[in-house]
């Protein structure tokens, strides 16, 4: 803790009703004397792509349940990747809500799931995780897995429809504003962008890039 939690590795965010000049003076008075160290930010080991590409099936057997809970996915993608915005929309089309392909085709049409969806949590400095998940009856476990895999393969193989693309963009952008409905949330995200070396206007142009995203380009790099 003492080695890495030092002023040169910190970013301080302050929001509220105050005068900037007075706040700067207060911060300097309270924190200016902290001794600077020499320890850089700790390096994060790179992911072993070869090992990550090896697939596997892992089972946890329980005899006291009546449902199967399935998680399938892999490590992929950072927020700095050029196709990040396209993949955000792709994930929403695949499994982001009640109008998604997984929900409509696997749950509503085929009745194979109690719940089903997908998520893609892209990392800022390391690849994130793409995850498709859900729950089903024990007897339909294999059918559920195959149905989800079919939808993942289909969205990687075929272009999405304009209707899906437009609906997903609107849904995502309408919900986006609630992620930043307070000054604290905005400041926290700006600090994270700054800490990881993203452009200062990343958040400012986020919605614009989502609106311009073209899923067919991004889809082919996710699988």
Task: Describe each PLM feature range.
Residues 29-38, 150-160:
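A common structural junction motif
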């Amino acid at each position: 803790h003492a080695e890495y939690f030092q002023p040169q590795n910190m970013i301080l965010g302050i929001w509220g009703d105050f005068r900037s000049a007075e706040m700067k003076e207060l911060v300097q008075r309270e924190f200016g004397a902290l001794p600077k160290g020499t320890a850089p930010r700790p390096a994060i080991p790179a992911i072993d792509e070869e090992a990550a590409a090896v697939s596997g099936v892992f089972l946890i057997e329980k005899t006291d349940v009546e449902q199967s809970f399935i998680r399938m996915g892999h490590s992929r993608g950072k927020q700095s990747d050029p196709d990040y915005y396209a993949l955000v929309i792709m994930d929403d089309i695949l499994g982001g809500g009640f109008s998604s392909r997984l929900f409509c085709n696997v749950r509503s049409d085929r009745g194979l799931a109690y719940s089903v969806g997908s998520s893609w949590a892209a990392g800022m400095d390391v690849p994130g995780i793409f995850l498709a998940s859900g729950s089903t009856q024990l007897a339909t476990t294999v059918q559920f897995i195959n149905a989800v895999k079919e939808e993942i393969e289909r969205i990687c193989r075929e272009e999405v429809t304009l209707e899906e693309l437009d609906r997903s963009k609107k849904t995502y952008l309408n919900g986006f504003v609630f992620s930043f409905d307070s000054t604290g949330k905005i400041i926290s995200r700006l600090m994270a962008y700054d800490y990881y070396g993203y452009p200062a206007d990343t958040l400012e142009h986020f919605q614009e890039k989502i609106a311009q995203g073209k899923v067919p380009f991004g889809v082919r790099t996710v699988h």
